[in-house]
């Protein structure tokens, strides 16, 4: 296991930078890479590419003086930690290579969380850190994809790609759901797609509002 502190190696600038590639570009042997965001920042956005080195799996950029470090394994697992003035209270963008499938885990809380994953293959998603506002844009599902949300939010928005479906199971802490068709108690469906595919979204945390839409 290799720990890489990008700021100290001058790979990612401490004063804000353009996207910089990770220095451990070994592709995952299983076909699924894993990103874990360990701690929060004021704003975190995860998007599909571009990654400047074709073999690299992720790159980051930020606004404001800050630093970050990443713990990488040869199997394509990356654990990302933000730091800097204000305890990492900065705006971060993480760009993921489009080639592998991704398992994404967000553990740290943020004020604004944007997961624009529409250009990726998403194999699973876990959001354990809370956010004031959360937007999750999901690509066409190639199989049944689990999405677990255990971190609370004032407002959660899920955008499902055309040609895919999503089923939301709402926990008792969820106050209101907009969009989607209710199916039984606290269960909602949006979109349509092939059998045995789609997103299974389970929200077990508290939320004032969840919005379901189809792009």
Predicted feature residues:
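Bacterial signal peptide processing site
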Residues: 15-17
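Post-signal peptide N-terminal segment of mature Sec-exported envelope proteins
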Residues: 22-38
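Sec-dependent N-terminal signal peptides
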Residues: 1-6
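Short, surface-exposed interaction patches in beta-rich subdomains
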Residues: 20-24, 46-51, 56-88, 126, ...
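Edge/loop elements at the starts and ends of beta-strands within beta-rich repeat scaffolds
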Residues: 28-31, 73, 97-100, 120, ...
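C-terminal motif of bacterial Sec signal peptides marking the signal peptidase cleavage site
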Residues: 10-13
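Right-handed parallel beta-helix
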Residues: 105-134, 138-142
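Extended Gly/Ser/Thr-rich low-complexity repeat segments
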Residues: 88-101
């Amino acid at each position: 296991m290799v720990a890489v502190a990008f700021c100290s190696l001058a790979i990612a600038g401490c004063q804000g930078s353009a996207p910089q590639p990770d220095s451990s570009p070994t592709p995952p042997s299983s076909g699924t890479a894993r990103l874990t965001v360990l701690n929060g920042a004021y704003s975190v956005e995860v998007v599909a590419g571009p990654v400047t080195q074709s073999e690299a799996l992720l790159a980051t950029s930020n606004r404001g003086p800050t630093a970050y470090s990443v713990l990488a394994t040869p199997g394509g697992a990356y654990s990302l930690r933000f730091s800097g003035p204000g305890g990492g209270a900065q705006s971060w963008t993480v760009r993921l290579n489009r080639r592998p499938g991704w398992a994404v885990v967000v553990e740290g809380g943020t004020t604004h969380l944007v997961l624009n994953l529409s250009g990726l293959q998403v194999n699973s998603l876990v959001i354990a850190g809370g956010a004031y506002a959360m937007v999750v844009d999901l690509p066409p599902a190639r199989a049944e994809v689990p999405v677990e949300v255990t971190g609370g939010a004032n407002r959660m928005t899920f955008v499902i790609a055309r040609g895919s479906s999503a089923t939301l199971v709402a926990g008792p802490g969820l106050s209101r759901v907009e969009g989607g068709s209710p199916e039984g108690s606290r269960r909602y469906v949006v979109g349509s797609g092939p059998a045995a595919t789609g997103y299974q979204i389970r929200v077990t945390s508290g939320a004032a509002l969840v919005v379901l839409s189809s792009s």
